[in-house]
Regions:
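Membrane-proximal interfacial segments on either side of biological membranes
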Residues: 1-98, 113-270
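Central antiparallel beta-sheet cores of small beta-barrel/beta-sandwich binding domains
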Residues: 5, 103-105
């Protein structure tokens, strides 16, 4: 702990060592990453407090190697307990609002604003990809930019984010996440139960208390209506274009060629 002061200003620097608990993080995040994240890890916090004639402001730098935490997310977001991942977060604010910026291993980013006196983030943005895209324009957005991945392992996480961001009628039941604005994905190659889609684009957004999903790829152009207000209603799928490529079919030319053995008798061809 260090501090300095003069007749007008006072500044304090405080270094804190704390422990990041995955379950506590999940609970405060309304269940997001439940079943994916576990364990505990030490974090170092460098807190700077400034009291000036113009008002109060602060800045907290949070760093950790996240050793002790385990991630069961799909690759490249899967992490063993002993594997180091760099966590670098900054929380800064004044007597009006607070800005949160977080990056994990330069693969995951979270940015949000929390106004003083409010219990819910605004302009929140989860980014899964290599580039930090900053704050969202409103509410909660999720951006997924990956070269290739499988769809099924991500479904539960997407459902957790949608559930956490649902805007309940009872204000007391609202959590820290704002209502969902959209989930946007751009994936070079998507594997959905061995069906392969190239240059895959997805946009999921609320529509009159339900969810509408727009899908585009080289092999697909479709819209999906998912009822959430009345779950007894059927899911409606409308496709303008669909061509199904299976992973086995893509590998077929190589596989068939490999079936020709070097010692095969081909004398009958001459």
């Amino acid at each position: 702990y260090t501090s300095d002061a003069n007749a007008e200003d006072y500044r304090a620097n405080i270094n804190i060592n704390a422990q990041l608990d995955a379950q506590t993080l999940i609970n405060h995040g309304q269940g997001i990453l439940d079943g994916y994240l576990s364990g505990q890890s030490d974090v170092d916090i460098a807190l700077e407090l400034n009291f000036t004639e113009q008002g109060f402001n602060y800045r907290a730098q949070v760093k950790s190697d996240l050793v002790g935490l385990t991630s069961k997310l799909p690759a490249p977001y899967k992490k063993a307990e002993t594997q180091p991942w760099v966590l670098d977060a900054v929380v800064q604010g004044d007597d009006i609002s607070n800005l949160i910026t977080t990056q994990v291993n330069k693969q995951f980013y979270f940015n949000a604003i929390l106004e003083n006196g409010k219990s819910q983030f605004s302009n929140a943005h989860f980014i899964i990809g290599k580039q930090d895209l900053g704050l969202n324009s409103q509410d909660l957005s999720v951006t997924i930019n990956l070269e290739q991945t499988e769809l099924v392992p991500w479904v539960d996480l997407i459902d957790q984010i949608i559930s956490a961001a649902q805007n309940e009628d009872d204000p007391e039941s609202q959590g820290i996440m704002p209502p969902l604005n959209e989930i946007v994905a751009n994936i070079g190659m998507l594997d959905f139960s061995s069906m392969v889609f190239n240059d895959f684009e997805m946009r999921l957004a609320p529509e009159q208390s339900n969810v509408y999903l727009k899908l585009n790829a080289k092999e697909l152009r479709a819209g999906v209506f998912i009822p959430t207000s009345q779950r007894s209603q059927p899911i409606r799928f409308n496709a303008d274009y669909l061509r199904v490529n299976f992973a086995e079919q893509i590998e077929a030319p190589i596989t068939e060629a490999a079936k020709v053995a070097p010692d095969t008798d081909l004398t009958w061809l001459t």
